[in-house]
Amino acid sequence: MIKLKSYFGEFGGMYVPQILIPALTQLEEAFISAQDDAIFQKELKYLLNNYAGRPTPLTLCRNLTKGTRAKLYLKREDLLHGGSHKTNQVLGQALLAKRMSKTEIIAETGAGQHGVAVSIAASLLGLKCRIYMGSKDIKRQKLNVLRMQLMGTQVIPVHRGSETLKDACNEAMREWSKTYEYTHYMLGTAAGPHPFPTIVREFQRIIGKETYKQIQKYEQCLPDAIIACVGGGSNAIGIFSDFVDIPSVQLLGVEAGGLGINTEYHGAALQHGSIGIYFGMKTSILQSSEGQVKNSYSVSAGLDFPSVGPEHVYLKNTGRVQYVSINDIEAITAFKKLSIHEGIIPALESAHALAHALKIIQKQPDKAQILVVNLSGRGDKDISTVHNALQKERDK
């Protein structure tokens, strides 16, 4: 059988206990066979179009760029059913789970967006669902926890370590190693052991495909730059994929600068990490000189992750994608600006990408340029977080 490439340059691989190799091999084989299965592809397309709501619009921000020569477009993944880009790939993985005769789904979630998306797919396709979530994230994402529970999902709090996404990932992987015969581990980002980074990228590729067609329809040309936030990296790799081979389009990934990348409180694994083995892959990790994984930090739960998908490390090393960071205050400011001027409340994760786009425009307001920001999710889940952060600023 044809095999997928398990490495991106030197990054990626399958660094897992021997017991999980058969499950990962089965998943790879199911994915490869599904690519040539017209019935599978027809079902996935039907669900994406008629259930999830694809294609999503490409929206021009007329107010935010007033007084400049720039055009700023938003790829509106926030309008997808479930509220974020996560729905794209969970529908694909859920169909793969059915194809492999699995009866249960287990997954991890940080911001809760992936957990909600998994719950949607499991509910739709009649699969049992368990979601592991750091207890800190449960507190800051109560709305998404309730949404998951409403759909019949068992949300399991993780009290280990920093009680955030990395600990939820570890716990979900641990559980999968015990139950893989009847469960499918639905990883939420383009990271982890092979074949997950490739599978997730391919299911998220629809974002870039649509953007490519839409921007040419509206502008009769390609954009100058595409900007996306990067935690694990699935929304970014999804929109980047159809533009990677077009050097005229600048690709910009935006990491969580937290309280500042010169502090210990950030999530910038690409800019300040070092190479190691983590979560079943060779990648860039925030780690100590002794190899201990450090705690990451971000005001946005979805970017609060100490590592990143291996393809992003490869794209950074080859120079094809430039990675920058935006701090909490800049992200919250962009969150407010989009809400006030365009009537769109973005996820805090997406607000990091928006903040960098606004920086580019502010630096050269007289430059005629076309920027596309992947608005990966909506911000309902973040309203109380932003409210609390603004309250703290006022109380200083």
Swiss-Prot record:
Pathway: Amino-acid biosynthesis; L-tryptophan biosynthesis; L-tryptophan from chorismate: step 5/5. Keywords: Amino-acid biosynthesis, Aromatic amino acid biosynthesis, Lyase, Pyridoxal phosphate, Tryptophan biosynthesis. PANTHER family: TRYPTOPHAN SYNTHASE (PTHR48077:SF3), TRYPTOPHAN SYNTHASE-RELATED (PTHR48077). The modification N6-(pyridoxal phosphate)lysine is found at K86. The gene is trpB. The beta subunit is responsible for the synthesis of L-tryptophan from indole and L-serine. One of its GO terms (molecular function) is tryptophan synthase activity. This is Tryptophan synthase beta chain. One of its GO terms (cellular component) is cytoplasm. Belongs to the TrpB family. PROSITE patterns: TRP_SYNTHASE_BETA.
